Amino acid sequence: MKKYLLEAAQLARGFMPHEEGMSLYEIALQVAPRSAILEVGSYCGKSTIYLGAAARETGSTVFTIDHHRGSEEMQRGWAHHDSELVDRDSGLMDSLPELRRNLEKTSLNDVVVPIIGDSLVVARHWAGDISMLFIDGGHGPVPAHSDYESWASKVTRGGFM
């Protein structure tokens, strides 16, 4: 992984330990050439940078889906709430500007396509196969299972979930 991307990933807001990010990167390098990578839940883009680095090296694309309003534990009054990510006009959590800044800083805009919305809605309309699925959206059992049920059948044979 290029040094500037590694440094950007380590500095990006997020909760993924570096070792897990490197595992994502290594797996993506192996499966990405087959078809696209899909990430459910990008937050500010920490894991997206690891995946995007692999996509850059393999000529693949990362599609990352997030509504950018935060999962339950990121809301006001919860342990992982970050008041710096609250939109001043709406008063709602909004991690999209931070994701965009991270994609600009890393020049990964040409290999990462953010999709703003609910993953279940996007899944109903998704027509292509994916070689790698990384589910890190809603962390409760119901949202995580719903994401799995909606996306698992779209992973190609020999792909990774």
Label each residue range with its predicted role:
Residues 2-161:
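S-adenosylmethionine/decaboxylated-SAM
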